[in-house]
């Protein structure tokens, strides 16, 4: 239900390597609208596009009360919009999960190029794991395999559900998985059995790596873009022998979490938002990086400019470059 004119809005922005998500909540933390965009290697342009689209979707007079950013480019997005809160993906995903399923104990989150597992007890994060090195099981790998099999990524999950005799696929490495799939095709196995075999392999790989040593207890939530794939949901349910819940807005949970955190921050702070306004969608931002030689660490420092002026720097082990 769209907010009425004059409604208070909290905006969350989640900028990842593959997708950029925005979510707008009302003062009662109900989702007003959301956006799911491909980052395409252009995080600044996608944040600006998202802001333009969101500005057009919100009714005239809706007041922005707080903005939060998260994701791998959270600092960049936060500087661009002057965010009120900048939080890591673990916190944002967990906050959104607890908001929708208060008794959640395990969150499986698989994005475009990384994956996470979050253990929650009594609404508090007690442990987590991340995999940002290997692409096996991520959305980008599934995209590649769908293209190779000449299947639309949207149809991959439905095809996996048709499998009755899934084949065993080596899922520890993307290279081995792909070669194994080719071998199974050449051996005459049905495509749906290969596809679901891949889903099972990727789910096992996730649990044996990201979930290694973790106590996975229900309720289990599956968040992130890969949760669109019903074959992956089926695979996790089969391996874990428990129901896996896919939240209605699973693909934008990070952005929802950032908006919830912004609402919480503004309630504590009590003053106005730092948000620069939707006009930043037309601003001329630029970025660059350099290697700091102040000590043997040789940190790579990222910096963002607006009209040639440095707005912020980050990435060092100390704060020598953060004092702009």
Show which residues each predicted segment covers:
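Glycine-rich phosphate-binding/hydrolytic loop that grips phosphoryl groups
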Residues: 95, 142-143, 248-278
